Amino acid sequence: MRSHYCGDVNKSHVGQEVTLVGWVNRSRDLGGVVFLDLRDREGLVQVVYDPDLPEVFAVASTLRAEFCVQVKGVVRARPDSQVNGQMKTGEIEVLGKALTIINAADPLPLSLDNYQNNSEEQRLKYRYLDLRRPEMAQRLMFRAKVTSAVRRFLDSNGFLDIETPILTKATPEGARDYLVPSRTYKGQFFALPQSPQLFKQLLMMSGFDRYYQIVKCFRDEDLRADRQPEFTQIDIETSFMTSEQVMAKTEEMMRGLFLEMLNVDLGEFPRMTYNEAMRRFGSDKPDLRNPLELVDIADLLKEVEFAVFSAPANDEEGRVAVLRIPGGAALSRKQIDDYTKFVGIYGAKGLAWMKINDLSLGLEGIQSPVLKFLNESIVNEIISRTGAQTGDIILFGADQATVVAESMGALRLKAGEDFSLLQGEWRPLWVVDFPMFEKINGNFHAVHHPFTAPRGVTAAELEANPANRVSDAYDMVLNGCELGGGSVRIHNQEMQSAVFRILGITDDEAKEKFGFLLEALRYGTPPHAGLAFGLDRIIMLMTGASSIRDVMAFPKTTTAACPLTNAPGFANPQQLAELGIAVVEKAVKTEG
């Protein structure tokens, strides 16, 4: 039905007859000549119909936005005065000779030109129309090229694309599972996989050595801007490779991807330990474009007569840290109060501050409600450590170390945006040496997942002192977003059983949930390691989209619903009866 895509017609085609198909982006009658902007996935081209062909002209005069049409015509160069530098095809136009309306279009329920006026509900309900917008089409085409580039790299490096089951068994991976009832086994359920973690480990035990999969994963969790109930991973696993080798290979892949797709050289990725990241930035995924850093000052405040500072300064689990904001002395009291409310979201009880109005005047040039509790030597040392200058403000976080890290880390990001401090476009890094476990309500939980290997200890040593052990894990971070995370896996039964015990998983529970894994570990399991990247997040960053919903063809809303299909929906009674399921409480369908 066509000879060329609309966006591919150029000056080399002048004089040629072309056949184009697509949608009417815009149609206008100017002085007896119809100008038609025809659109397909590759772009726009202008088609001109004049009255010399009355029958064709009559049809062209009836066209409205989003009619699906076929155009036949001759390519001609535009006069210099009419060249449109904003269009890829702006040097040419097509003189229409024939026109077929393939399908007319009713008036659209949403605007494709002024899409900012469309609600997200509208955009998702009429997603097939929203995806006609060039911006959306370009993102999905970009995504297709990224997945193709990833496959080429992994294929050329000996990785095998192997599918793993979608219907599987529930395993504790941090989020709720989506359950699928079994008709054959009444009262029993499959779970949709949160990741192919155990299957890819089993593939290493099977001897496949290098595996990858671009795979759908499912998590029934609370949604945020960068979360969806179903999402796509670039899943990778290797045998006989160390964590250093896995990081080197996947860094090579990511650097090549950015160079090919964006012509950006990311350079060599720096390394940073988890402890350093939390200390300096209050986050295990620091945005290195932001020059602001947290500075510890607890050692200066142990003896001050101000319990807000001295109590956490003398508490082993407490922390006092400050954040210097260049130019922040200009903040009004209301703006400081707004920052105080902001850190309160993260559990902080307040936000002390110190304005450096004039450094040359000593204490006289400093304004702060806590200045009366601090002597001159303490103030001078705080100024020295932070590098504060006249016109700056120093903000104080004093609380439990976890609260200080989270609240001041979030404030660092907000201040960086508010004061336009971000430097550079792309700042990648590896974060390494994560703790094996974290304590929540007195119980140990795996920081990554329960199959992550510790670094440099035996099973007995791990059980004897689990709190201070470091995992052989690594996260790739870019601009404050975790692109992917991975680890060396446990490859012997003794260590895996020890980790289960530390996590409070009884032997019976371990056998019931992971018996197949524990048995597999008895039969010559090779050392193995891997990593999984969030494809949606990578595309979001590379395209500058504000949400992963804008780089997925048919995403869910923030309430995990699909306005297009009205999913989830109620099952009919016969289906439920076959599954042995009775709905005991009336379900309320949430719009949104």
Swiss-Prot record:
| Binding-site list for ATP | R219, D220, E221, Q228, E482, G534, L535, D536, R537
Which locations, inside or outside the cell, does it occupy?
Answer: Cytoplasm
Question: Region Aspartate: start and end of each range?
Answer: 197-200
Q: Name the top EC class.
A: ligase
A GO MF term:
ATP binding
This protein's major location comes to cytoplasm
Q: Which GO terms describe its biological process?
A: aspartyl-tRNA aminoacylation
Instruction: Detail the disulphide connectivity of this chain as listed in its UniProt entry.
Output: none
Where are the membrane-spanning stretches?
none
List the catalytic activities from the record.
tRNA(Asp) + L-aspartate + ATP = L-aspartyl-tRNA(Asp) + AMP + diphosphate
Q: Which CDD domains match?
A: AspRS_core, EcAspRS_like_N
Give yes or no: UniProt keyword Chaperone. no
Residues recorded as binding L-aspartate, renumbered to this chain, are E173, R219, H448, R489
Give the EC number. Answer: 6.1.1.12
Q: Does the keyword Membrane apply?
A: no
Query: Sorted alphabetically, which InterPro entries does this protein's record hold?
Result: Aa-tRNA-synt_II (IPR004364), aa-tRNA-synth_II (IPR006195), aa-tRNA-synth_II/BPL/LPL (IPR045864), Asp-tRNA-ligase_1 (IPR004524), Asp-tRNA-ligase_1_N (IPR047089), Asp/Asn-tRNA-synth_IIb (IPR002312), AspRS_core (IPR047090), GAD-like_sf (IPR004115)
Family as reported in the entry's similarity comment: Belongs to the class-II aminoacyl-tRNA synthetase family. Type 1 subfamily.
Subunit composition? Homodimer.
What's this chain's function? Answer: Catalyzes the attachment of L-aspartate to tRNA(Asp) in a two-step reaction: L-aspartate is first activated by ATP to form Asp-AMP and then transferred to the acceptor end of tRNA(Asp).
The molecule here is called Aspartate--tRNA ligase
Q: What species is given as this protein's source?
A: Shewanella putrefaciens (strain CN-32 / ATCC BAA-453)
